[in-house]
């Protein structure tokens, strides 16, 4: 039996895309893999163990070594700044981080309020712009903040822009593009470099347009 590779995977839409990518790379995952409600899924025939986590927690699991590798959004990596290796851009779950607000709304006072679940990214961005702002951290329904007067603007993930439009908000600034990345724990990479390199190579072939034989 070979070395078992433990992977942290984000629950939700990214998980389904990532599972599809692994299948394309030739990994035999159970048919019910995506529908499973288990938080730990063992795939012994591939020497793989999957830990299903909230997207914002994947980098934490990998940094602390409870997972050897993982798939995480670049947004989470920028926000959390964990000590992990970014091995490969998987080019899935494409979206971008943006500033948005009500159309025609002026900045409020000296330090406008910015609502976001990415306080570190938002602070860094506005600091680079030379703007002093007050950051308000929220965990969800970020679009609500300008509508109820909690914030002047928001910093959030934009995919299709539909949620902004439905709430009467407009995007005013594009911060950066986001995709999901294959990340690795530095110590695990030294111990399991062969299996990790093989997975990275197989995934890279799929990303570059080839399919596993």
UniProtKB/Swiss-Prot annotation:
GO BP: L-histidine biosynthetic process
Domain of life: Bacteria
Record keyword Acetylation present: no
Major place of residence: cytoplasm
A Pfam family hit: HisG
Keyword presence, Transferase: yes
Pathway annotation: Amino-acid biosynthesis; L-histidine biosynthesis; L-histidine from 5-phospho-alpha-D-ribose 1-diphosphate: step 1/9
GO MF annotations in UniProt: ATP binding; ATP phosphoribosyltransferase activity
Keyword annotations from UniProtKB, A to Z: Amino-acid biosynthesis, ATP-binding, Cytoplasm, Glycosyltransferase, Histidine biosynthesis, Nucleotide-binding, Transferase
Record NCBIfam families: hisG
UniProt record similarity statement: Belongs to the ATP phosphoribosyltransferase family. Short subfamily.
Subunit relationships: Heteromultimer composed of HisG and HisZ subunits.
Domains as described in the record: Lacks the C-terminal regulatory region which is replaced by HisZ.
Protein name (database record): ATP phosphoribosyltransferase
Species name: Bacillus velezensis (strain DSM 23117 / BGSC 10A6 / LMG 26770 / FZB42) (Bacillus amyloliquefaciens subsp. plantarum)
High-level lineage: Bacteria, Bacillati, Bacillota, Bacilli, Bacillales
């Amino acid at each position: 039996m070979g070395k078992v590779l433990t992977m942290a995977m984000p629950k939700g839409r990214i998980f389904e895309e990532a599972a599809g990518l692994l299948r394309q790379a030739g990994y035999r995952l159970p048919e019910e893999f995506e529908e499973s409600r288990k938080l730990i899924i063992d795939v012994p025939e591939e020497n793989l163990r999957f830990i299903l986590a909230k997207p914002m927690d994947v980098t934490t699991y990998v940094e602390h070594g409870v997972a050897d590798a993982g798939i995480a959004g670049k947004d989470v990596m920028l926000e959390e700044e964990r000590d992990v290796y970014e091995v490969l851009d998987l080019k899935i779950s494409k979206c971008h981080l943006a500033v948005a607000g009500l159309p025609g709304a002026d900045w409020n006072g000296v330090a406008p309020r910015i609502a976001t679940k990415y306080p570190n990214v938002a602070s860094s961005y506005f600091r680079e712009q030379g703007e002093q702002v007050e950051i308000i951290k929220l965990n969800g329904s970020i679009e609500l903040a300008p509508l109820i007067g909690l914030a002047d603007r928001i910093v959030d993930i934009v995919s299709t822009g539909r949620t902004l439009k439905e709430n009467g908000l407009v995007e005013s600034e594009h911060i950066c593009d986001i995709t999901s990345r294959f990340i690795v724990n530095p110590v695990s990479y030294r111990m399991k470099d062969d299996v990790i390199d093989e997975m990275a190579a197989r995934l890279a072939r799929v990303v570059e347009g080839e399919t596993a034989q």
